Amino acid sequence: MMKKLTSLLLSAALLVGMLACGASAKTNTTVRVAGLKGPTTMGLVNLLAMEKNGTASQNYDLQLYGAADEVVPKLIKGEVDIAAIPANLAATLYQKTNGGIQVMAVNTLGVLYVVEKGDTVHSFADLKGRTILSTGKGTTPEYVLRYLLRKNGIDPDKDVKIEYYSEASEVTAQMAATKKDAIAVLPQPYVTAAQMKDSSLRVVLDLTREWNKVCDTQLITGVTVVRTAYAEEHPEEVINFLKDYQKSVDAANDDLDGTAALCEEVGVVAKAAI
């Protein structure tokens, strides 16, 4: 997966360099953007506010989905132009489409944690023989978890049982329904959401920290991709998007409360307090 991702990120550098050579102009085109509920889309939500107040360079149709497999067919069929998706999925799609998508930006670094409803897990060794609830089958959470289990001497197919759910909200609901000793892999902000509902839930492992112990590469969780054909046919729209995207991210950093409220309004997170 790392080789695929490296190739994809190199193509991203070439894409940005190519676009930097052109001049941007305001367009009347509506750019179709797909995002997943959760951290990968938080940097995008201020595009909606910018569009509303007239500061966006163009119009955006931002659609949110609960699982990555809902976005994939839309990308392949050309029903969306740009999408925020898990990094490993971007690498897979890049290979399957022979370069039909390219990375525009890294949108999420390490946001994955192992949480427990109890006090029995204090290291990876304590996960042996346990059941782990997780979201993201076939995407970054699965690959990161399995990789780190192996690196810590645990066979993910024999030594643990991993139960996958399509959305992180399903995992948090399952955790809430379990009396004790439930273990899950969750991204932020779902960790905080789960802790708000159950104060006994605690973070036992920061998977970014664990990754850094065994890898010399940065853990990239999510990226924003564009269809290559769209980038070639609509360079002005792509340049404008990149500029608006940067403004949206800056707005998120400068106005956390306002962005949190917007995230709740559009469904990126359940509650702004998260």
Where on the chain are the PLM-derived regions?
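Short, low-complexity disordered leader/linker segments with a strong preference
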Residues: 1-30
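Structured segments of extracytoplasmic/periplasmic soluble domains
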Residues: 47-50, 74, 78, 92-96, ...
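Residue-level detector of short, conserved catalytic/binding motifs and their immediate flanks
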Residues: 12, 112, 222
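Short, glycine-/small- and polar/acidic-enriched structural segments
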Residues: 26-165, 182-188, 204-205
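An acidic, carboxylate-rich microenvironment
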Residues: 70, 126, 170, 258, ...
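An extracytoplasmic/periplasmic, membrane-proximal ligand-sensing/linker region
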Residues: 28-29, 39-40, 195-196, 257-274
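Pocket-lining segment of extracytoplasmic ligand-binding domains
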Residues: 88-89, 170-263
